[in-house]
């Protein structure tokens, strides 16, 4: 005699549903473009569906240094915000970023989480001209902060 199929199937919610994320990347090192490419490659380990904007040359904000190269990156991750921030900080270190270099105004790699699902981070950065210029190149459809 065969067992009859269960009368109901209970499914658990998918707790690993991907989160939409956006990060700002920047470097003022002579090899900034190569470092940005390296950071994107490293981030592909924990962020999928990566979309990268063009990379712009910008003037430094808040430090005396040479120009920066900046871009935005969007994608999806199963990491929560705190896990993602930790992974981004490790990516910065893997790109050579060190506190001692930052004290000398050399930023090998700076990665700021700007968006995790609907939560905005670094809200003061959203008004920066390069972020406003690059936002239309992303798949993010949020209105700018007012």
Please tell me what each predicted stretch does:
Residues 73:
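Short basic (Lys/Arg) and small-residue
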Residues 2-46, 53-59:
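N-terminal beta1-alpha1 ligand-phosphate binding loop
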């Amino acid at each position: 005699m065969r067992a009859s199929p269960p009368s109901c199937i209970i499914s658990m919610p998918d707790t690993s549903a991907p989160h939409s994320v956006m990060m700002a990347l920047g470097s003022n090192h002579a090899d900034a473009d190569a470092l940005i490419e390296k950071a994107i490659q490293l981030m592909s380990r924990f962020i999928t569906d990566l979309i990268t904007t063009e990379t712009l040359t910008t003037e430094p904000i808040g430090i005396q240094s040479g120009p920066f190269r900046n871009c935005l990156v969007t994608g999806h991750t199963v990491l929560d915000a705190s896990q993602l921030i930790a992974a981004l900080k490790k990516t910065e270190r893997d790109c050579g970023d060190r506190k001692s270099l930052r004290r000398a105004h050399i930023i090998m790699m700076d990665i700021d989480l700007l968006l995790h699902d609907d939560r905005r981070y670094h809200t003061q950065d959203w008004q920066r001209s390069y972020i406003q210029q690059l936002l239309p190149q992303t798949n993010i459809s949020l209105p700018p902060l007012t």
